[in-house]
């Protein structure tokens, strides 16, 4: 599991406004942590692109349909939630945008 890879992940159970159901998510934790720990940090991806907020990263042609990475939906999960192999890997220019969105959302 590597930073920037996109996996289908089962985010249930969820509470309130947390991203839910099975959805693609991008791994944002560092590779050394991904190798050593039983968890990874991910950011949820949605195909609801009606509004793009400053903490979102638009993905026009990365998945089957236009989508966005939602940096406000970041969480650490068990690797057991990952459903199969990665479906793609975000290119470095998009990962830089994800990093910027995370910095904005987390005030880093």
Predicted regions and their residues:
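Conserved functional hotspots at enzyme active or ligand-binding sites that engage polyanionic ligands
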Residues: 1-108
């Amino acid at each position: 599991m590597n930073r920037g890879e996109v996996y289908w992940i089962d985010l249930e159970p969820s509470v309130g406004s947390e991203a839910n159901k099975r959805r693609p998510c991008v791994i944002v934790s560092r590779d050394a942590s991904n190798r050593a720990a039983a968890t990874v940090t991910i950011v949820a991806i949605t195909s609801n692109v009606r509004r793009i907020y400053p903490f979102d990263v638009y993905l026009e042609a990365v998945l089957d349909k236009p989508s966005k990475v939602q940096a406000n939906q970041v969480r650490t999960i068990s690797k057991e939630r990952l459903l199969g192999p990665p479906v793609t890997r975000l290119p470095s220019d998009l990962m830089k945008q994800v990093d910027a969105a995370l910095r904005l959302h987390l005030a880093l």
